[in-house]
Amino acid sequence: MLFRSSAYQKSPVGCLFYDFFGGNTLKADVSISVTELGSLLDHTGPHLEAEEYIARAFGAEQSYMVTNGTSTSNKIVGMYSAPAGSTLLIDRNCHKSLAHLLMMSDVVPLWLKPTRNALGILGGIPRREFTRDSIQQKVRDTGGAQWPVHAVITNSTYDGLLYNTTWLKETLDVPSIHFDSAWVPYTHFHPIYQGKSGMSGERIPGKVIFETQSTHKMLAALSQASLIHIKGNYDEETFNEAFMMHTSTSPSYPIVASIETAAAMLRGNSGKRLIQRSIERALDFRKEVQRLREESDGWFFDIWQPEAVDKAECWPVAPGEDWHGFKDADADHMYLDPVKVTILTPGMDEQGNMDEEGIPAALVAKFLDERGVVVEKTGPYNLLFLFSIGIDKTRAMGLLRGLTEFKRAYDLNLRVKNMLPDLYAEDPDFYRNMRIQDLAQGIHRLIRQHQLPQLMLKIGRASWRERV
């Protein structure tokens, strides 16, 4: 046995490391040679018990713990489901790990093309892409392609759009479907997500459904904690070969323990309450921003959402509505997750119409960053925030306070030196006498001059030949 925890205490710098992380954390980082703990690679002992427990919690027939991230989980599922020489359908809005899978495997990809609005938000793959006629046309247009044996779909999108997975599972004519659900490991634990996740509902005859999740995203688990869930008949021995190919023989036991802990936190009514609190926190924040916008003198931030957000639900991206900015949206197809909050800044509407004046979101993101508020994603005029189970009222109010402080400072037209000191420090000569409104309008004019939103849409059409 390797006594790594004791080894740290053999040197001064090691003692500092030991004191920072604590003895229990380092003592838990044991060697795979500890037979009492079983094996992650062979799925024996406590590891097997944990995976069976997790499967029951997440509504799967079988679950696998992965200690090097969903990037690895995606490759495991792909290498099992799409053998060399086969053809697969793959979301053009896929994670880089799936692009790496294509580089590693001798497979033929048929791209499923998502829509995109002027804000830069991906709207999911339209229903027309999933029809037999559309898939057959892709096969005819792609050299070496055959009818696909597997499909990969990103659910949800980064911005929080979820598919009607019940329809997809019943409609898509392939033997196996993989939902890359890295950002939504919580969907099984609240009724508003019913029919919008891979493991939702009963098994589909003749199909196997895979769902990969980043347990450390949005839940309580250590970084690189990931899960593979399976529903349907599959070859366990062959699957485990792919699992072992991508799994270290020295897995991190603290990561394993954190995955099982995350499952335990979510089981039963206590888990539902955790997710319910996140949803309520996000809804309260959305309503407060809308209230401030209605009461504000002049401008204030807006939120990308329907007009009525009175109750906990996933809001449909319905055809004929302007708020989402997607042309030809399908009915009962895509839904907005309430815990994924996109803030809109002045300057452009959802249809891509530019105003004379505007506040590029990058300036707001910089202001918030200098105050310790993490922005998940920044577009030209939008910012994404995630309301995970770790977000409490204090943090939510901290974000709201940051937005109101930005408005106050912007309306006072403070100097960049005083409002964004870190930005000023990057080039004092350039920003010396500049005020925030001058900087904002200068960037906004450049965006208008070069027609950035339209250019981004053209890039999308050039890459995907997509009509947005």
Q: What are the residue ranges of the model-derived segments?
A:
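Alpha-helix N-cap/helix-initiation sites
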Residues: V66-T67, S252, T378
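Long, structured ligand/cofactor-binding scaffold of large enzymes
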Residues: F17-F21, T25-M104, L110
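Short N-terminal secondary-structure initiator segments
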Residues: E49-S63, A182-Y193, G201-V208, V317-D328
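Short glycine-rich or small-residue beta-strand-to-loop segments that form or flank ligand, phosphate
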Residues: L37, Y64-V66, A151-T154, L384-S388
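Intrinsically disordered, low-complexity boundary segments flanking structured domains
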Residues: A50-Y53, D141, G198-S200, S214-T215, ...
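Non-catalytic terminal extensions of PLP-dependent enzymes
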Residues: M1-S39, T44, R56, N269-V468
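Conserved PLP-enzyme active-site core in the AAT-like
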Residues: T70-R293
